[in-house]
Regions:
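Bacterial Sec-dependent N-terminal signal peptides
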Residues: 1-20
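Alpha-helical interaction segments
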Residues: 5-6, 32-35, 117
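Short, glycine- and small/hydrophobic-rich beta-strand elements in well-ordered beta-sheets
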Residues: 15-26, 55-93
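Intrinsically disordered, low-complexity terminal tails and linkers in eukaryotic proteins, enriched
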Residues: 21, 79-146
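Acidic/histidine-rich, surface-exposed loop or edge segments in extracytoplasmic proteins
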Residues: 24-37
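Extracytoplasmic/secreted envelope proteins and their assembly/folding machinery
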Residues: 28, 40, 44-48, 108, ...
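Sec-exported extracytoplasmic/periplasmic mature domains
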Residues: 36, 45-56
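Surface-exposed, polar/charged faces of alpha-helical domains
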Residues: 38-41, 53, 60, 84, ...
């Protein structure tokens, strides 16, 4: 195929194979985490080796709430920065697509369940030290019809 036709075919395939989790007008949660220039590796390690492990293992006493939490975990995506921002910070993007109303999106209960009160405070302290003064920005969005 000539390059123009090949590009057109690949573009069409890409648009028709996109698999969105949320439906049109369904809520999504997008969180931007702003990380200090020298804390990217530390944040990445805490995030994937401690925070997300605790979140994945968390078990709620209420089976209905646990079902919501399980659905939320399946809808959760983390985008790691490919490079440093122009201001020498790093930005991680967390997406809940869809946002599951009633599910647990706070990390402290899962940290406390896995590591105990003191351990959770210690992990949370190290986690918090990684953020810039801007910390995190959270946005609720809705999928637009395309």
């Amino acid at each position: 195929f000539p390059p123009v036709i090949l590009f057109s075919i690949l573009t069409l395939i890409a648009f028709y194979t996109v698999n969105y989790n949320s439906k049109v007008d369904e809520n999504q949660l997008v969180i931007l985490s702003h990380i200090k220039s020298d804390k990217n590796d530390k944040f990445d390690k805490i995030l994937f080796d401690e925070v997300m492990v605790a979140a994945a293992e968390y078990q709620d006493d209420d089976p209905n709430k646990q079902k919501l939490n399980d659905k939320a975990m399946r809808s959760f995506e983390i985008l790691k920065p490919a490079s440093m921002n122009q201001d020498s910070t790093w930005t991680y993007i967390f997406i809940a697509d869809p946002y599951v109303e009633g599910a647990l999106y706070n990390i402290m209960p899962s940290l406390k369940q896995k590591y105990g009160e003191e351990g959770a405070e210690e992990v949370f302290g190290r986690w918090s030290e990684c953020f810039t003064d801007d910390g995190q920005d959270a946005y609720f969005t809705k999928r637009a019809e395309m």
